Design a protein with these regions (language model features):
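Short glycine-aromatic motifs
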Residues: 48-49, 124-131
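Short amphipathic alpha-helix that is part of the acyltransferase structural core
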Residues: 1-35
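Active-site rim helix/loop that mediates acceptor-substrate recognition in acyltransferases
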Residues: 30-49
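Residue-level detector of flexible, active-site-proximal loop/helix-junction positions
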Residues: 10, 87, 142
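Acyl-donor binding region in acyl/amide transferases
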Residues: 73-126
Length: 143
């Protein structure tokens, strides 16, 4: 397995490959209701977000990831905004190591991500991530 950080100029050429992974991640957690796929593409192409792919030993993309850098008064955070793919157990550590290296290069103090509890227990807890809060969402019905 290999992980690659994509240059913003690479995005149009790989979009058809990474789109299904990102679309699935957006829809799984209903994020697409407030952040449509077209906006993900816009942010990747503009450089506001960073795109990553994980490629298996056969050269097949098995995951697509989107990160963002959030600037806070006391330090920057690399946020894993979207992650879609299969068999995270095969590449999760690879992703973690790459994001840690990227955070160090960017001078970020933290890495944050959201996750289902099951993935958190199996993956993030083991790597030393701390659960800081749980996120809840309520959809207001405008009539």
């Amino acid at each position: 397995m290999q992980i690659y950080k994509l240059n913003k100029e690479d995005i149009p050429g790989v979009w058809l490959t990474i789109r299904p992974f990102l679309d699935s991640a957006l829809n799984k957690y209903e994020v697409s209701k407030k952040f449509p796929l077209e906006c993900v593409l816009r942010d990747l192409v503009s450089g506001a977000s960073q795109g990553w792919v994980i490629v298996n030993d056969s050269g097949v993309v098995v995951s697509a990831i989107v990160t963002e850098i959030e600037h806070y008064p006391l330090g920057d955070t690399v946020i894993i905004f979207l992650m879609g793919g299969e068999s995270m157990g095969d590449w999760g550590d690879l992703l973690h190591n790459a994001i840690v290296k990227y955070a160090e290069e960017m001078g970020a103090k933290w890495i944050e991500t959201g996750s289902r509890r099951g993935i958190g227990k199996l993956f993030y807890d083991r790597l030393g991530y701390k659960r800081r809060y749980e996120s809840y969402s309520y959809e207001v019905k405008c009539e």
